[in-house]
């Protein structure tokens, strides 16, 4: 693809229209401040741009946009496909007010098998490379972790980081509960581990029956050689795999990789629900809510939608023909026009989603859609980019139809939930969940814990942990931790200590629950395991920047916890509220949300509560320490007499205010000692 020809023309509408070519390309409208208003593509730039200035019946909002245009830039391209690609890139980069815009989720989760001698299985976000194996993308972090748990149970691949793997001298707890074959200590050969890795990869690719057949052959071979222990191990592996396949029976279809896209519009908002099928397994879905929809759809309703040919939808059975309006009676024609208008809204949104979500990313061979996208060029460009034909299925049958129906229902539910949450604390929770790519059907279950360290010049160091759950702060679950055994003022050591103390026991409880279930022959997650796992938070906020987050990452790695839940809250310039930056432990780029962000409002609320709780605890501890230290300095007053004085007068202040006679009335305090105490305190 050659570089397109670009031009910037001073804004004089008549001159601009006269100079525009009858060629495909992209146009951009700017206001007087230089802010981009709209980005569009056209197969004929002259006709398309002229329509904004020559059409007499424009809607008020379109007319308002046209009056704000102060500059037009155009870029000529060789083809409509090239224009489509450039348009998508510009929309992502410029976020124009009048374009439909989806949040750019560059950190879609994958399951990664590393290129190590003993490959590690890991949750991964970010760009993929050719060195490691990647499976996905997955619709949510939960789907990745569920797959990892399945592979641990069936194939027992390692999940520890290489730094931990290289320094192990004995098997970890995962080996003891049958979740890892302990290659770190040579408990399995290179060849056998490689077979497990190959089987796991084929399982993820949807070739489960092939894996099961090979395991059965392997079991019989061991039995024929009288290697009954090895045969029993393979039998157990087959049993675990059979259990998994049985649990997923309703999810598995003949398709290997399919994406299902359902679009629903209601109450001025639009939801696109994306469901993913990978390796024949339905992995769940994710709801997307585009911004700038109202402005963009006003353009479409005003007759200025893009000049496109509908994309052709295909399936094993023929689709219903496209409805027309011309040959219908007047009343039916009016109704059909209304339906067509509504359909165009969803088609425009679907076009925007497909372009912004798939261009530049992996595309499955089949997209099942609730509405036919407006642009055929888009489908052709996706196929060219993917290196294989990408088919759109508009009216699916069988299992695909059930998947689409479920996606549409989930889109309606997600949209209804969003509308009910707007303007409330639930809206803040939703905003934070979307910002951090946390997926859950019930945000009330979202548990956030936040940590803060407080001290005065290294004195009375104390850490606080506050909890946000069910859309509110849970004060009964707040905890304070006295930090000891560190260099005064060492916040990093304090953070390491509190995180270790907080989560080490939780990890042990979860492991013990799994071990008990394993011994009892219970497959899957029991109530015992669920209760142990529910104690762990979904998001952990750290009041601090990169240094504190790195310490937290080290602790979580040592404990085997997911580092993607760690979020640092770094203070902005001058420590002003609204200028904070979110720092991540899993390699994601730092994020600045801005003062008006509902997500940042919730983060600040939780962070400030942690700070308040830490400060009050630190002050109380410091005051108590200072009181105790003054009494400890009194000559002739040991531990027992000190306790009696505190019990009688309630603290240092009461002892200081007491007279000699009152001091002498305390058991074990003579009149002479009372006078001595009085003189030392005054």
UniProtKB/Swiss-Prot annotation:
SUPFAM superfamilies, A to Z: C-terminal UvrC-binding domain of UvrB, GIY-YIG endonuclease, RuvA domain 2-like
UniProt keyword annotations, A-Z: Cytoplasm, DNA damage, DNA excision, DNA repair, Excision nuclease, SOS response
Residues of the UVR domain: 209-244
GO CC, one annotated term: cytoplasm
Keyword Transferase appears in the UniProt entry: no
Role description: The UvrABC repair system catalyzes the recognition and processing of DNA lesions. UvrC both incises the 5' and 3' sides of the lesion. The N-terminal half is responsible for the 3' incision and the C-terminal half is responsible for the 5' incision.
Subunit field text: Interacts with UvrB in an incision complex.
Protein name: UvrABC system protein C
Organism for this UniProt entry: Burkholderia orbicola (strain MC0-3)
